[in-house]
Amino acid sequence: MSIQEHVILVNDQGEVVGTQEKYAAHTSHTSLHLAFSSWLFNDRGQCLVTRRALSKIAWPGVWTNSVCGHPQIGETTEQAIARRCRFEVGVEIAQLTPIAADFRYCEIDPSGIVENEICPVFAAQIVSPLKVNPDEVMDYQWVELTSLLRALEATPWAFSPWMVSEAANASEKLKHFADNVKA
């Protein structure tokens, strides 16, 4: 992306306390910041699972939910999700629905990079053809949600930690969404 992205730094109450350049923010001492996580579904109710590009600084090559990112100053979370969906997987979305509005996590990847985010979780339906950005996504699969939830429970080490936690906290809402988008 040609525009330099920032993260919005927040305190424990979610109040904005500043901004920082995205790559400078993600270190072994990452400050709490705003993010979002989205689970995208097709009209068959299948979930898009993506494998993070090897060039990603945190969790490279790891399987995760569809699209994640950070809202920018002056941008709503919904606008940020639509922007990142276009950038990462080349799609337009509809029916953007909050699944876990208060989700928060802090995890350390194997290289020592910390993710420390207030990260509301959303589900949405893809309404245009998929065109993945290889700088973001090295592979992807469409999977039945029930199979994915079983895999997350059986082999959590094979997926991003935020995806595992999101599924554990919001599986019923994800199932409901998947059932409702089936054509």
UniProtKB/Swiss-Prot annotation:
Localisation per UniProt entry: Cytoplasm
Cofactor(s) named in the record: Mg(2+); Mn(2+)
EC number per UniProt: 5.3.3.2
Binding locations of Mg(2+): E88
Classification via CDD domains: NUDIX_IPP_Isomerase
Chain residues that bind Mn(2+): H26, H33, H70, E115, E117
Major enzyme class: isomerase
UniProt pathway annotation: Isoprenoid biosynthesis; dimethylallyl diphosphate biosynthesis; dimethylallyl diphosphate from isopentenyl diphosphate: step 1/1
Catalytic activities: isopentenyl diphosphate = dimethylallyl diphosphate
Location of the Nudix hydrolase domain: 31-165
HAMAP family registered for this protein in UniProt: Idi (MF_00202)
Protein name: Isopentenyl-diphosphate Delta-isomerase
Organism per entry: Enterobacter sp. (strain 638)
